């Protein structure tokens, strides 16, 4: 793990993601942003498959928090946010993988634009067989993953609403935009 305070904290919540978590973490570990500039916090949300074993393979490179039972995505993300040391927070879902410049570009943009509250990246959709379907413009169809926030602003709006089981990202964005737009 890092010896200095990280610039970015990446939060990954994982519930029964043994099939995808390794690829996700490998993509996060091979970033152009130096590894001592970010931390990866994985919240294992009470997985009953081999997700804990997969996470153990990365134990030297990630910080793992384990929920003793499934608490849900919003609660797990919030737990990661509360643990995060960095001033910038980005959520990446366990079944996602990111470009090698992902953290570098997002961090650089937000760091160079103090008047901007958050920054999102476009994303690509693939089907179950890894066939590329389309590139999505995040300004038209934003999702919860891939948005770099300032940690203090997430804390100020109360983070994710843990009563939401679906669309927690949309609800968070609505509250965020009301306060910061």
Residue ranges and their predicted role:
Residues 1-27:
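N-proximal low-complexity "stem/linker" segments adjacent to membrane-targeting elements
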Residues 6-9, 39, 171:
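Cell-envelope/extracellular polymer assembly enzymes that use nucleotide-activated donors
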Residues 26-37:
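Short, acidic, metal-binding catalytic loop of nucleotide-sugar glycosyltransferases
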Residues 44-53, 69, 93:
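A conserved acidic beta->alpha catalytic loop
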Residues 67-84:
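Glycine-rich, basic loop-to-helix element that forms the pyrophosphate-binding segment
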Residues 89:
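Short aromatic/hydrophobic "clamp" motif used to bind/position activated sugar donors
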Residues 101-133:
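Conserved donor NDP-sugar-binding/catalytic core segment of glycosyltransferases
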């Amino acid at each position: 793990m890092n010896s200095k305070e990280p610039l970015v904290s990446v939060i990954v919540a994982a519930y029964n993601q043994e099939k995808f978590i390794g690829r996700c973490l490998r993509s996060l570990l091979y970033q152009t942003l130096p590894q001592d500039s970010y931390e990866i916090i994985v919240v294992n949300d009470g997985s009953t498959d081999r997700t804990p074993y997969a996470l153990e393979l990365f134990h030297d490179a990630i910080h793992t928090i384990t929920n003793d039972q499934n608490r849900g995505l919003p609660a797990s993300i919030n737990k990661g946010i509360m643990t995060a040391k960095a001033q910038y927070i980005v959520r990446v879902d366990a079944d996602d993988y990111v470009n090698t410049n992902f953290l570098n570009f997002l961090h650089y943009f937000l760091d160079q634009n103090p008047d901007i509250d958050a920054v999102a990246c476009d994303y690509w959709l693939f089907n179950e067989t890894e066939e590329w379907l389309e590139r999505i413009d995040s300004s038209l169809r934003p999702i919860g993953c891939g948005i770099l926030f300032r940690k203090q602003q997430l804390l100020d709006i109360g983070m994710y609403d843990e009563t939401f089981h679906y669309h927690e990202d949309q609800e968070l964005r609505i509250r965020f935009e009301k306060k910061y737009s």
